[in-house]
Each structure stands twice: as C-alpha cells, then as structure tokens.
C-alpha cells in the first residue's frame, strides 16, 4: 500500500484549492481529487471570463484570474493533484485509514475534506424543438471567450445572476444585447439589476421562448408575451441560454452522512457524521449558511485545523499566517 496522505480533498474548485493551501501551511501531506480534467470547478469550466464581486480585497476579479491566484497559492506546498477521477466510495480500514475508491483506482488517507460544491453539473437545455442541433454552432450555455461575441447580435435567456452579469459584460463588446426573461422581476442581485436597467441592453419581460429557426445556426427566435400573447420575432447571431444547471452529488449520496437537500449537514467544526470526514464550501450546510465563495474560504481553515488534530493530537493551535507561513517555508 502506498504511503497514506494526511488529508485528501475531494473537489478542486476555489474552496478546494484554498483548503489545499491551508493544509500545506499546517504541514499536512495533501492530495486533491477532481472529477473534471482541470482544476477551478465551475469558475474555470463555466465562467472563466465572468467577474466576481464578493471576494474580500478585490473590487472585482475575473473568475479565471481568481483560479490562477488560488493555484499559485496552493502550489507553494506542492499538493498532489489527481484529475479526471470520480470518488465512488469510501471504506474505513482496521488501522483507521480511509480507503477512497475512484473510477480509476484507490487512494489512502487519514482524513477527508469534501469541497465538491454542488457536485457534477449539466446545463438545463433551451427546451424548444430542434434546439439541440444548434449546440455546436451559435447556441451557448456558458461564455468561455468574450471576443467571439464581438460586433454580433447576442440574445440571452434567463433571469438569474449569470444572465444579467453576462448581458452587462457583453454590452460593450457585442453589436447589440437582448435579455429575455419569462417573469417581470429578475432573481439577480439588486445592484446588477439596477445596472442592467441603466444600460443599453434591450430587456424583454415577461416573454417565453416559443421556437427557434435557422439552417446551420439559429437565425431567429420567436417569443410570446406571458400576459398579452403578443408574438415577437428577434434575429440573433448568437444565443446564450442561462436557465441554470442541474447538479448531482452522484456516489457521494451513498455516503453515511446527513443530507439536507443537496448539501451535507456539518457542525461548527465542519465535521460530518463520519469521523475523520469534513465538509466545507457549498457542499456543506448549517443553520444560517450563505452560499458564497467567501463563506467557503472561511470554513476551509476550520476543517483543516480539525483534520490536523486528528492526524496529530499534539499539534498546537494555529498561529497567524505571517509567522506560520515563514516557519513552514523555512522548515
């Protein structure tokens, strides 16, 4: 059997990366297992060009830039990254170690920290006839490269933060931006909705999508007013569907932890119902928790410090980062 790790972090999103950094500061041998072929979670996969506004110290930061900073930070302590593997099951061994079984092999660890966010995810489809045949051309479910929309007529559908944020970000780049929502009110943050209404974005509410037409790509979209049945046909060079994502925790649902909807109940120490298994970030829940990256950043050190005590009961209480970081780097 290979030498076990002190902690194995399941999930390589922003909270998982910060957890890896902090466990490195606590001089723990650290492994990160990520089911996607790249680190960064939804930020890197779905929203790399999107700005984030609620990270302390950054008035705004592009998602990919935040991921790059987190990777640079975590890599100070050379954690082991395992990409493209999905954890299927765990087993407590007689010697107290935890054996993690993935779709490609086995991993041995003393503790586990779950930072899998909302789990695996898939975009909710556009939901009209023949739409799927345009998914390889000009129907998009997320925006990876802003420049591809330069000087083009872009129609976005949705009423949440992503739809509003992308509309505002594409406004100075695209030839025109139209945002269509089936309700009168948007679910996005109040401030960004105010920015939307003060922008040049053409806002259409409450309209539902009836059909799309086109040969090799979507050329027109037909909308019906939800109250008056008025029909409007809108031309488009690109269509961005922001109806959200369906997420699943997959095999984690079989673990002997307490679930609350799609999250795992933890206590104030980030402990789950399984000894030695902790959770932080959006996969964790407790009374009053707010689903923000910033919240997960605060939970990560709690989980790591508790895991450290299990690995080494004689470990001292963590010091401030300045003295701790210098001590570890000079070790």
Curated annotation (Swiss-Prot):
It catalyses: 2 reduced [2Fe-2S]-[ferredoxin] + NADP(+) + H(+) = 2 oxidized [2Fe-2S]-[ferredoxin] + NADPH. It comes from Exiguobacterium sibiricum (strain DSM 17290 / CCUG 55495 / CIP 109462 / JCM 13490 / 255-15). SUPFAM superfamilies: FAD/NAD(P)-binding domain (SSF51905). One of its GO terms (molecular function) is NADP binding. Pfam families: Pyr_redox_2. Keywords: FAD, Flavoprotein, NADP, Oxidoreductase. Belongs to the ferredoxin--NADP reductase type 2 family. Its EC number is 1.18.1.2. The keyword Zinc does not apply. This is Ferredoxin--NADP reductase 1. Coiled coil: none annotated. FAD binds at residues 34, 42, 47, 87, 121, 282, 322.
């Amino acid at each position: 059997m290979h030498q076990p790790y002190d902690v194995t972090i399941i999930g390589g999103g922003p909270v998982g990366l910060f957890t890896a950094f902090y466990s490195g500061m606590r001089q723990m041998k650290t492994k990160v297992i990520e089911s996607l072929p790249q680190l960064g979670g939804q930020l890197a996969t779905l929203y790399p060009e999107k700005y984030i506004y609620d990270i302390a110290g950054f008035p705004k930061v592009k998602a990919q830039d935040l991921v790059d900073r987190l990777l640079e930070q975590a890599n100070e302590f050379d954690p082991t990254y395992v990409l493209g593997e999905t954890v299927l099951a765990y087993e407590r061994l007689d010697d107290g170690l935890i054996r993690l079984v993935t779709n490609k092999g086995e991993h041995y660890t003393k503790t586990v920290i779950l930072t899998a966010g909302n789990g695996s995810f898939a975009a909710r489809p556009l939901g009209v006839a023949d739409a799927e045949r345009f998914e390889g051309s000009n129907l998009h479910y997320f925006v990876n490269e802003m420049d591809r929309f330069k000087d083009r007529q872009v129609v976005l559908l949705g009423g949440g933060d992503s739809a509003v944020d992308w509309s505002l970000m594409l406004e100075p780049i695209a030839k025109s931006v139209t945002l269509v929502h089936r309700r009168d009110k948007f679910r996005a943050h109040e401030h960004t909705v105010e920015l939307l209404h003060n922008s040049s974005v053409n806002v259409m509410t409450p309209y539902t999508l009836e059909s799309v037409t086109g040969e090799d790509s979507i050329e027109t979209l037909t909308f019906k007013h939800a109250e008056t049945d008025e029909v409007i046909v809108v031309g488009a060079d690109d269509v961005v569907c922001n109806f959200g994502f369906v997420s699943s925790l997959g095999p984690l649902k079989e673990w002997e932890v307490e679930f609350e909807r799609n999250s795992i109940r933890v206590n104030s120490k980030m402990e789950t119902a399984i000894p030695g298994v902790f959770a932080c970030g959006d996969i964790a829940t407790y009374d009053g928790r707010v689903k923000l990256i910033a919240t997960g950043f605060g939970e990560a050190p709690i989980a790591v410090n508790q895991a450290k005590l299990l690995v080494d009961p004689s470990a001292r209480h963590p010091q401030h980062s300045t003295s701790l970081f210098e001590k570890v780097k000079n070790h």
